[in-house]
Each structure stands twice: as C-alpha cells, then as structure tokens.
Amino acid sequence: MSFWKNKTLAEMDTQEWESLCDGCGKCCLNKLIDDETEELYYTNAACKLLDPKDGHCVHYVQRFNFVPSCTQVTVDNVAELTWLPDSCAYRRLHLGRELPSWHPLITGSKEAMHIAGMSIKNKVTCETKVKYMEDHIVLWPLKDIE
C-alpha cells in the first residue's frame, strides 16, 4: 500500500514515518555554511556513527547519547530543515513531490538507491579522520533524480 500517497506527514504513524527514510545517509554528512553568503555546502565527511558501506547509523536508537547534536527529523521540524537534500523523502513529501523511482518503498530494497548513486555508500570518510572540512566539499549529495 502506498500510504505516503494517502496520508499527510502528520497523519503517519511511527512505523510509516520511519519507513520514509531511504537510508541514503546524506543527512549524516557534515555541512558547512558560508558566513558571508549563507550558502550550504555538503562534505563527504560523515558522522562517526554512520556505516560508510551501507549508510545506516550503527547506534540509531541511542544516537543522541553519542552525538547530542544529531537532529531528529519530525513532522514539526521538517519544514525548517532546509539542509535536508532535495532527494530526501521527508523533504520531497513536505514539498508535495512524489517519492523517486529508486526509493526502497517503491523498489522493495535499497539496491536501486545505491545503483542510482543516491546514497553515501563508498563515498565518505569518517569525520574523525578529517582535518579541514573545507577540503571535503562535494557536490554529489545535491543530486536528485526521479
């Protein structure tokens, strides 16, 4: 059932809400904001809890204990989280867009997402190994395909 087509984000239960996350890992990338222009830049430096091979958080349930600055995406804050990538299901649905063809809820697995290049799989380094974030700015997280 395509619950995301029949319900608003606010109407979804916890299981439905959590299943919207495709697990791409882009939200777990460190981001920089230019002080003068306020432009957002993604880096390939991932949160220390992110598994670079598949994009899942190794301590998802307890992530706030390990990374207090981690942001939980909720129906109440999704509109404010402008740093979420355009490919993010929460952002897409909030903006009235459809889920993309590669989304795991459409395809039944994360493989199509990885093949489409929409995840962090094998593209990141751990933030603890980065000396200068500016040296790790990348454009691929901005990619958004239907």
UniProtKB/Swiss-Prot annotation:
Cystine pairings recorded for this chain: none
First and last residue of the signal peptide: none
InterPro entries to which the protein is assigned, alphabetical: Puta_zinc/iron-chelating_dom, UCP006173
Pfam families: CxxCxxCC
PANTHER family: UPF0260 PROTEIN YCGN
Similarity comment text for this entry: Belongs to the UPF0260 family.
Official protein name in the record: UPF0260 protein Ssed_2516
